[in-house]
From Swiss-Prot:
Gene Ontology CC entries for this record: aminoacyl-tRNA synthetase multienzyme complex; cytoplasm
Family label: Belongs to the class-II aminoacyl-tRNA synthetase family. ProS type 3 subfamily.
Oligomer status and interactors: Homodimer.
Protein name: Proline--tRNA ligase
Protein's gene: proS
Function according to Swiss-Prot or TrEMBL: Catalyzes the attachment of proline to tRNA(Pro) in a two-step reaction: proline is first activated by ATP to form Pro-AMP and then transferred to the acceptor end of tRNA(Pro).
A GO term for molecular function: ATP binding
Enzyme Commission identifier(s): 6.1.1.15
Length: 493
């Protein structure tokens, strides 16, 4: 039964199916009765809650406060920022009526045609418009600035091809929206939040990222600059893990958000927006997990340590439970989340397989012989290595082991990326190498036409213009025209 529990399609056979199998079998999420919308199950939601708590603390440490704005946005609001609405128009879900009525033949309910709204309402795909309409009421003077708001919410984008966590019609996210008195302040804010996201990705998700700026055609709709963090998944595809947008005065002008500056002159407010979503759970899975199941970094694992008793009698279980109670108390005192699984409806082998599948970083097992010898078996999920150690000082041992696992998971992902990022100088070589599932650094002439040609012919996109690294100019691999620096190309989720 334990083998059946873990039967996953191997990554080498079908990476996409492996991912789908794992999300379902590890009890993270499932499809719902609504097309493109998922049910996030308790274990998956526990990971999101940990992400939320950590990010929320990071936002508050950088001066942000939480607020909540309406789910429904008047259609006219979206019409005020042309670029913005064009970017989201095809994905918008529209509310046209406000009432149902019982069908005359008694077969159920129908939309009441008399309840048609005068103006349709859009279920938010993102909240810039409703928030900037509100900011107009909050801002009169430079003394009212900056406004640094974050919102935890759900949004809807009517995606046609959906995949659990990675791309769903409805998803959970946070969206920050800030207003500033100067361009410089807003640009600093946008870059700062990119740094916050990179810090979270690398130090909590154990996922190395490349920080960069999006090309003009890949920017957020209505942004002057989009700062991104890009991660490599195990199949070599890129995943955009977070974005921060410098919006200039576009929304200030669209919603007439003006203020009197220090010199007594009227000006439009400067804007940023930034967000990450439940997509990060998909990134977490694809960055670290293996053919045995999830591999979760300890900093985000809902259960960091599980303890399984192995016993032959009720009396022996009682003795093991008494011994384990002291270990549990010591681990919890160090802030470690621990579960003691003494349920009698599953055998130890089943439990081992289940917690391996669920990616619990450390598994402890205690049997009768361990009880006699004051020992305990320790298994680490990242390497599947086992050893038997003394119970004396077990809490410090486990604490250090969790940090070692966190560092090792990051190093493994970092080494994988570094081994699969290459420089390419010719378009022929580019077309050949992109099939290998790699990140490619290549010269581009800066035109959207060349970018589009590469995308159409190879399915690779410019993920970003990296902020760090080699800035040596060169010649575009396609046109031979001058190129300011190499940019990052990859196929992407």
């Amino acid at each position: 039964m334990a083998k059946e529990l873990k039967e996953l399609t191997p990554r080498s056979v079908n990476y996409s199916q492996w991912y789908q199998d794992l999300v379902i079998k590890a009890d993270l999420a499932e499809n719902s009765a609504v097309r493109g919308c998922m049910v996030i199950k308790p274990y998956g939601y526990a990971i999101w809650e940990k992400m939320q708590r950590i990010l929320d603390d990071m936002f508050k440490e950088t001066g942000h406060v939480n607020a909540y704005f309406p789910l429904l946005i008047p259609k006219s609001f979206l019409s005020k920022e042309a670029e913005h609405v064009e970017g989201f128009a095809k994905e918008c879900a529209v509310v046209t009526h406000y009432r149902l009525k019982t069908n005359h033949d008694g077969t159920g309910v129908v939309v009441d045609p008399a309840a048609k709204l005068e103006e349709e309402l859009i279920i938010r795909p993102t909240s810039e418009t409703i928030i900037w309409n509100t900011y107009r009421n909050w801002i009169q003077s430079y003394r009212d600035l900056p406004i640094l708001c974050n919102q935890w919410a759900n949004v809807m984008r009517w995606e046609m091809r959906t995949r659990l966590f990675l791309r769903t019609a409805e998803f959970l996210w946070q969206e920050g929206h800030t207003a500033h008195a100067t361009r410089e302040e807003a640009e600093i804010e946008a870059k700062k939040m990119q740094d916050v996201y990179a810090n979270f990705a690398e130090n909590y998700m154990a996922m190395p990222v490349i920080k960069g700026v999006k090309s003009e055609s890949e920017r957020f709709a209505g942004a002057l600059d989009t700062y991104t963090i890009e991660a490599m998944m195990q199949d070599g595809k890129a995943l955009q893990a977070g974005t921060s947008h410098f919006l200039g005065q576009n929304f200030g002008k669209a919603f007439d958000v003006t203020f009197i500056d220090k010199n007594g002159k009227s000006d439009y407010a400067w804007a940023t927006s930034w967000g990450v979503s439940t997509r990060l759970i998909g990134a977490l899975i694809m960055s670290h997990s293996d053919d045995n199941g999830l591999v979760l970094p300890p900093h985000l694992a809902p259960i960091q340590v599980v303890i399984v008793p192995i016993y032959r009698s009720a009396e022996q279980l009682t003795q093991i439970s008494e011994k384990v109670a002291g270990i549990v108390a010591k681990l919890k005192a160090l802030g470690i989340s621990v579960k003691y699984d003494d349920a009698d409806n599953k055998k130890p082998g089943w439990k081992f397989a289940e917690y391996e599948l669920k990616g619990v970083p450390v598994r402890l097992a205690m049997g009768g012989r361990d009880l006699e010898n004051n020992t305990i078996e320790v298994m680490r999920r990242d390497t599947l290595e086992k050893e038997t150690i003394t119970c004396d000082g077990i809490e410090e041992y486990v604490k250090n082991l969790l940090e070692e696992i966190q560092a090792n998971i990051f190093k493994k992902a970092y080494d994988h990326r570094e081994a699969n990022i290459i420089n390419v100088d010719t378009y022929e070589e580019f077309k050949e190498k992109i099939e290998d599932g790699v990140f490619i650094m290549a010269h581009w002439d800066g035109t959207p036409e060349t970018e589009e040609l590469i995308k159409n012919e190879t399915k690779a996109t410019i993920r970003c213009i990296p902020l760090a690294g080699d800035k040596t100019p060169g010649k575009c691999m396609v046109t031979g025209k001058p190129s300011a620096c190499r940019v990052l190309f990859a196929r992407a989720y």
